[in-house]
Amino acid sequence: MNFEWIDYYTEFATKLLTFKDNREELIHKIYSIYDNIGISVPKLEKDDEITDIDPFTVFGLFNKGITNNNRILILNGIASEFQISANIPVNFDGVPVLNNLKATFYSFIDERNDSDIDNIWELFEAAINFSESNSKENRQRFIEYYNIVHEQRCIKWNITIGLYWIRPYTFINLDSRNRWYMVDTNNMPDEFINAINKKLNKVPYAEEYLEIRDICQKTFESAECKYKSFPELSYYAWIESERVNKELKSEDKRASKAYFLRWFKPLIQALRDLGGSGTPAQARQKIVENEKLTDEEISIKRGKNNANKFENEVAFARSYLVKTGYIDKSVYGIWTLTDAGKNVEMTDEL
């Protein structure tokens, strides 16, 4: 793990705050940066002419789907223009990125309210103040502006990503990788999952977001927890999701012979026995009971990470059953049969 980016990101966030009431100069600097490095300014407004900008969108300029070379070029340009003293990062472990097609935190000028960008700046300032002092006043101001921004167009889970960028030891990133990772019992304790699971069904308001943050920080204090910070959690989530995605792509090419086909029927039956839905752990336990699996069969490890073979195969089976419409994936940490899953006539290969 290499978190060299944190010093740069936090210093830049602090300097960016000084432009809260001088956005014209900030926009001028952005144009200057891109001109100096020889890259076109991305589309940030309807007519390609930036009239206003928020700080999280500025961070998004170098935290989206671009090459590492261009990313480092932009960071060098920013360092020069804003006199950043921290080292230019070349490693970005644990940094979530935006979709290139959704890289602004505001709607274009004809679709946004006059106060939308102002509100984001207020949240940005409140977040930095909160990170420096978790006082009652700072916490309340953060809650106030987070909840205001929460209701604005173009704001979804990206708001938690933006907060994490600017103060990664204070705010938790709730992008899709982290949400997926945190509700897996292989990665976090049951007590934690039970406490946060329902809070991840939709973008949380400030009170629930801070509750998730606080519960997570409390979990980090446990001697058994291998993560001690939000950046470490994000890093491990990225590593694991990349591993799973790679395996899924590999298996996709030979799906007809996939070893996890054997779990289609047992998984559907297990969820039926559970009343139509259950946690991954409940589903696996029901499969063990129904199939009379031995401890030896469900304890086999494989791969460099010593991943549990049974749990992985059931997870892959679930992914394919989601793709084919038999299991619903809308609720994190809960596997639920669709109407098709409830009524399908089961064979070994469905």
Protein language model features and the residues they cover:
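Minor-groove-contacting beta-hairpin "wing" of winged helix-turn-helix DNA-binding domains
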Residues: 333-338
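Short, amphipathic alpha-helical interaction segments positioned at domain boundaries
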Residues: 340-350
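Short, positively charged loop/turn segments that connect secondary-structure elements
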Residues: 196, 258, 288-315
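Short helix-capping/hinge SLiMs at alpha-helix to coil transitions
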Residues: 168-169, 272-276, 289-293, 330
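Positively charged, polyanion-binding regions of nucleic-acid-associated proteins
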Residues: 254-281
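A short, conserved structural fragment
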Residues: 322-332
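An N-terminal alpha-helical hairpin/helix-loop-helix interaction module that forms a charged
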Residues: 1-152, 168-250
